[in-house]
């Protein structure tokens, strides 16, 4: 259902404001997480025309196509723990990610978890025998304001279809995938993505010479947190300006919707999941540090990590692949075996830190700008941000 705030075609923030400067680093070709070589995504969106109370879905992120046999290094950061990310204990224990990352709604975690296992068993069992180890990674945010959680719309088979259908195309944004029913900073939110490219060097040769390399940092968010009063774009207090304009106009219907969304968020602030990917060769401790930098991007937009907000950040690197399913009778678990890998020097990591913060910030903007006004469960309505109004406000400060 459309409203004045979504009559104009939806645009990503850079399309709307091409002269806006966001950080020091250029974007990748798609300005999305799939700019990181090998990373694949898929979104399943559930908004049946016959039942507007269903507004949900799931997003699948594959670190690389061979995720089952070869893990990648990963690190986690929890800004506020009112949420769930399965498999996180094992990532903390080993620094390894060997699962798809699935983002969905709070009540669909079990079905998504089952879906990852169903797919793994289908493709990796021999005569009913399972002789491998893998813990699915599923994260959630709460979409109960716009989605009827009691009907459990997400099914396990949707996860398998998402894994098989994942591509390197730009991830659809806004009301898509796991972000379909989400609300962010008082506006319709959802799925958003962005990327940055950072200059770097490969390992030195025998003569001490290192060849230039470009590294990519890509971010995907499922954004479902915050209040309109705190919403900022590149430092501009857009949310407060919009609130003041609405009060001056005296549109009772709009003010009523605004108050309804604000009240719902005050009762249950709904969380943000941030997935950060890079091809820079980083070890788990460095990746935990990268994940922490998502906090800076979130704070710039207006996130505070409120009590009931599950703000969970996962970073992984495709720079090294670690075999995890190659156990054989000749493997001696008591005989330590060395692997040869590359890692980035800590003293050269600042550009990657900046890229992580900047891409997180822009991914949230894209989630908000690409989302459309939605009328959902019990007639609840959440308006998309008015892009014309946003542009007019920002151009006064640029």
What are these regions (language model features)?
Residues 2-398:
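Alpha/propeptide regions of enzymes that mature by internal proteolysis
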């Amino acid at each position: 259902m459309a409203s004045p705030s979504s009559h104009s075609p939806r645009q990503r923030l850079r399309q709307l404001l091409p002269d806006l400067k966001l950080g020091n680093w250029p974007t990748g070709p798609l300005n999305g997480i799939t700019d990181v070589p090998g990373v694949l995504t898929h979104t399943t969106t559930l908004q049946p025309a016959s039942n507007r109370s269903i507004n949900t879905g799931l997003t699948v992120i594959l670190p690389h196509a061979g995720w089952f046999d070869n893990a990648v290094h990963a690190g986690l950061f929890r800004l506020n723990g009112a949420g769930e990310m399965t498999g996180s204990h094992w990532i903390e224990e080993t620094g390894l990610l060997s699962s798809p990352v699935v983002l969905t709604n709070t009540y669909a975690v079990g079905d998504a978890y089952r879906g990852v296992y169903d797919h793994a068993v289908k493709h990796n069992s021999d005569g009913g025998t399972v002789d491998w180890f893998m813990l699915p990674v599923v994260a959630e945010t709460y979409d109960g304001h716009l989605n009827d959680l009691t009907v459990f719309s997400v099914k396990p088979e949707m996860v398998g279809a998402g894994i098989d259908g994942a591509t390197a195309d730009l991830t659809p944004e806004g009301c898509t995938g796991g972000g379909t029913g989400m609300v962010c900073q008082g506006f319709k939110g959802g799925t958003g993505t962005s990327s940055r490219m950072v200059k770097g060097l490969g390992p030195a040769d025998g003569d001490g010479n290192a060849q230039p390399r470009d590294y990519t940092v890509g971010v995907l968010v499922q954004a479902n947190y915050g209040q309109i009063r705190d919403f900022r774009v590149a430092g501009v207090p857009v949310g407060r300006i919009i609130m003041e304009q609405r009060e001056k106009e005296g549109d009772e219907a709009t003010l009523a919707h605004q108050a309804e969304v604000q009240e719902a968020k005050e009762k249950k602030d709904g969380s943000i999941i941030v997935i950060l990917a890079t091809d820079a060769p980083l070890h788990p401790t460095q990746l935990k540090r990268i994940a922490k930098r998502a906090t800076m991007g979130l704070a710039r937009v207006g996130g505070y990590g409120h009590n009931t907000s599950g703000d969970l950040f996962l970073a992984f690197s495709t720079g090294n692949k670690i075999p995890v399913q190659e156990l054989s009778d000749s493997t001696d678990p008591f005989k330590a075996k060395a692997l040869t890998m590359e890692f980035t020097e800590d003293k050269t990591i600042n550009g990657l830190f900046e890229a992580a913060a900047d891409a997180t910030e822009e991914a949230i903007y894209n989630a908000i700008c690409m989302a459309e006004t939605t009328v959902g469960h019990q007639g609840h309505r959440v308006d998309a941000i008015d892009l014309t109004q946003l542009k007019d406000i920002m151009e006064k400060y640029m």
